[in-house]
């Protein structure tokens, strides 16, 4: 972690995604090659004692889900480019009412089970309530919308569309860069870097990431200034 304190811009978090915000919080300059290791501690708002891995829309759980524990089919990079995450490509038909997503092969959940189209269908059916999501084959998913939406790939980059294992959707098991080690609702998330990941060499520079819930802005600011955390949610 750089010696410089870092502040998380809430607007950047929502426009570039939690993963990009986590990497931006390192304080490393654009020309400085990233180095692996250490712990990143983030002080965030928005946590509640009712948070679960399937419930909780505050900033705290958004960061915990996306960029740490789980992946989505698509992602928006730090420079605003839409690209595939668990999807390697997608095609639209019927005027953007029907979509096919091709899944990345050889991806595994943190419990060792392989990612398949069935996991994607189970994950998306619960949130795309007005769409039909169907398995085409093990690595292909078809989404049929009630009305055309040319922005569906962008929509699916949001944290509510993370992909969970169909056999354990509420367990905090994902395909993300970090494996869950400790979760205390409304208080803390601790996760450690997985040994191998398809994003190796491009993301996930820390050995561990810890999210700490601090509801009060002034207390988050104090924790940051005293070096108790490495980055904090301090909206202007």
Describe each PLM feature range.
Residues 37-46, 98-101, 141-142, 176-178, ...:
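Short, well-ordered beta-strand elements
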Residues 2-20:
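N-terminal secretory signal peptides and thylakoid transit peptides that target proteins
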Residues 43-94, 173:
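N-terminal lobe/hinge region of extracytoplasmic solute-binding protein
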Residues 171-200:
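Bilobed "Venus flytrap"/periplasmic-binding protein-like clamshell domains
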Residues 196-236:
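Ligand-site clamp/hinge motif
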Residues 89-129, 136, 142, 223:
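Aromatic- and charge-enriched surface segment that lines or borders ligand/interaction sites
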Residues 125-166, 177-184:
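Surface-exposed binding/hinge segments that line
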Residues 25-26:
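N-terminal signal peptide c-region/cleavage motif recognized by signal peptidases
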């Amino acid at each position: 972690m750089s010696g410089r304190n870092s502040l998380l811009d809430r607007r950047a978090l929502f426009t570039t995604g939690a993963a990009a915000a986590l990497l931006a919080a390192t304080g490393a300059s654009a020309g400085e090659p990233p180095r692996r290791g250490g712990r990143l501690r983030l002080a965030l708002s928005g946590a509640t004692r009712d948070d679960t891995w399937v419930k909780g829309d505050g900033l705290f759980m958004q960061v915990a889900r996306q960029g740490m524990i789980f992946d989505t089919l698509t992602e928006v990079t730090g420079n605003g480019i839409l690209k595939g995450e668990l999807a390697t490509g997608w095609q639209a038909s019927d005027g953007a009412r029907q979509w096919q997503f091709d899944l990345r092969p050889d991806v595994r959940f943190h419990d060792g089970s392989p990612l398949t189209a069935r996991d994607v269908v189970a994950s998306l059916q619960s949130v795309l309530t007005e769409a039909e999501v169907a398995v085409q084959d093990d690595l292909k998913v078809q989404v049929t919308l009630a009305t055309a939406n040319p922005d569906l790939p962008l929509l699916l980059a949001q944290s509510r569309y993370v992909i969970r294992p169909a056999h354990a959707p509420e367990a905090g098991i994902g395909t993300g860069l970090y494996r869950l080690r400790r979760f205390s609702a409304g208080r803390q998330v601790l996760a450690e870097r997985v040994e191998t990941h398809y994003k190796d060499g491009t993301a996930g520079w820390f050995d561990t990431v810890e999210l700490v819930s601090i509801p009060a802005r002034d207390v988050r600011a104090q924790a940051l200034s005293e070096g108790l955390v490495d980055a904090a949610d301090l909206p202007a």
